[in-house]
From Swiss-Prot:
Pfam families: FTSW_RODA_SPOVE. GO terms for biological process: cell wall organization; FtsZ-dependent cytokinesis; peptidoglycan biosynthetic process; regulation of cell shape. The chain crosses the membrane at residues 14-34, 52-72, 79-99, 112-131, 141-161, 162-182, 188-208, 268-288, 304-324, 341-361. The gene is ftsW. It comes from Buchnera aphidicola subsp. Baizongia pistaciae (strain Bp). Its EC number is 2.4.99.28. Its main location: membrane. This is Probable peptidoglycan glycosyltransferase FtsW. Belongs to the SEDS family. FtsW subfamily. It catalyses: [GlcNAc-(1->4)-Mur2Ac(oyl-L-Ala-gamma-D-Glu-L-Lys-D-Ala-D-Ala)](n)-di-trans,octa-cis-undecaprenyl diphosphate + beta-D-GlcNAc-(1->4)-Mur2Ac(oyl-L-Ala-gamma-D-Glu-L-Lys-D-Ala-D-Ala)-di-trans,octa-cis-undecaprenyl diphosphate = [GlcNAc-(1->4)-Mur2Ac(oyl-L-Ala-gamma-D-Glu-L-Lys-D-Ala-D-Ala)](n+1)-di-trans,octa-cis-undecaprenyl diphosphate + di-trans,octa-cis-undecaprenyl diphosphate + H(+). It is an enzyme of class 2 (transferase). It is a multi-pass membrane protein. Peptidoglycan polymerase that is essential for cell division. NCBIfam families: ftsW (TIGR02614), PRK10774.1 (NF008042). Keywords: Cell cycle, Cell division, Cell membrane, Cell shape, Cell wall biogenesis/degradation, Glycosyltransferase, Membrane, Peptidoglycan synthesis, Transferase, Transmembrane, Transmembrane helix.
Length: 380
């Protein structure tokens, strides 16, 4: 008999890293939201209490979803996609308009952002499609176009909201997954050209997007108008320097920087925790992404294709969304309205991203269980 196999059932590093980011998120939401929470609700901890409530909900979600086998997601991928499309249609009918965008559905005191669910739903569907029709996608151009055409309908709904940021994250992740599946680089050229032309037309024809682009090129031309948010963000980052001003000592959060606790929370992180603190948080997010890639690689090696592609899609999603959020904060990209995963205030983003990571942990768990079963089979 061989010695007892010493394999941990869960990826503890992934679990602890996620938990640390969630706690950092609550801390930074508290610090960045106190002024606006007091002005609007006369309660300095209004947003903190809601964020903690989301974490409590996450605790129960974790216990439920961790027991859900990956086969459930594969079998029900089309239903999940249809539910996502239904909510995207619903938001256009009864959604609340915020800053010119229809992104929220509010029922009583509960609000949800359908675009967050759309990411998980589309990557679930795409992972199943790639796992079943990989040879068709790799060997002919029609097979390559099919998944892009299928996801184009929900993407159009996202553009109607408009939510260009989520659309870009989904497109980049989709193209990256197709590349990972073995598709030759030549097939991407016409698709990328179409995307570039379409994006350019959408920007030119939409005053909302065009203004964002113009303010991005040189925010200092109109620092108190169209370039106000970006200039305030850059001032926050510049003030933070290497070590930061200290937790709670941000000046820009005193309602100088709009969306300080949501889309632009990274600027407050840079101001209070400095370059070192900001880079540490980015490292932790990228650590989760690279763990996802490692898990995906192991799954593909074991020919568990759905789990492999799903794991890769989660890792790519986190990387692209983080890069776009940080890029807008530091002035490298136009404002997109995307949250910083696991950090920014907001229930929809926090819960959906956390569910994605729970799925990732479940994929890893099933791979470990397979190794344990294989060990005991050879042991007998």
């Amino acid at each position: 008999m061989k010695t007892k196999l010493n394999i941990k059932l869960y990826d503890e590093k992934l679990l602890w890293c996620t938990l640390c980011l969630l706690l950092i998120g609550v801390t930074m939401v508290t610090s960045s939201s106190i002024p606006i929470a007091y002005r609007i609700y006369h309660d300095m901890l209004f947003f903190t209490k809601k964020q903690i409530l989301y974490l409590v909900i996450l605790f129960f979600i974790f216990k439920i979803f961790l027991d859900v086998p990956i086969s459930f997601w594969q079998k029900n991928n089309k239903i999940i996609l249809l539910i996502s499309i239904s909510t995207l249609l619903l938001v256009l009918i009864i959604g609340n308009s915020i800053h010119g965008s229809l992104r929220w559905i509010t029922i009583s005191y509960v609000s949800m952002q359908p675009s967050e669910l759309s990411k998980l739903a589309m990557f679930c569907y795409l992972s199943n499609y790639l796992s079943q029709k990989n040879s068709e996608i790799v060997n002919n151009f029609g097979g390559f176009l099919k998944p892009i055409i299928i996801i184009s309908f929900p993407l159009i709904l996202l553009l109607v909201e408009p939510d260009l940021g989520t659309t870009i994250v989904i497109l980049l992740t989709t193209l990256s997954l197709l590349f990972i599946s073995g598709t030759k680089i030549q097939k991407f050229i016409p698709t990328i050209l179409i995307i570039v032309v379409t994006t350019t037309v959408l920007i030119i024809k939409s005053p909302y997007r065009f203004e964002r682009i113009m303010s991005f090129w040189n925010p200092w031309n109109d620092p108190f108008g169209k370039g106000y948010q970006l200039t305030q963000s850059l001032m926050a980052l510049g003030r933070g320097n290497i070590f930061g001003m200290g937790l709670g000592h941000s000046i820009q959060k005193l309602e100088y920087l709009p969306e300080a606790h949501t889309d632009f929370i990274f600027a407050i992180i840079g101001e209070e925790l400095g370059y070192i603190g900001a880079c540490t948080i980015l490292f932790m997010i990228f650590f989760i992404s690279f763990r996802a890639f490692k898990i995906g690689k192991i799954a593909l090696k074991n020919k568990i294709f759905f789990s492999g592609y799903f794991a890769f899609s989660i890792g790519l999603w986190l990387i692209f969304q983080t890069l776009i959020n940080v890029g807008t904060t530091i002035g490298l990209l136009p404002t997109k309205g995307l949250t910083l995963p696991l950090i920014s205030y907001g229930g929809s983003s926090l819960i959906i991203v956390s569910i994605a990571i729970i799925i990732l942990i479940r994929i890893d768990f099933e791979l470990r269980m397979k190794n344990i079963q294989a060990f005991y089979k050879t042991d007998i």
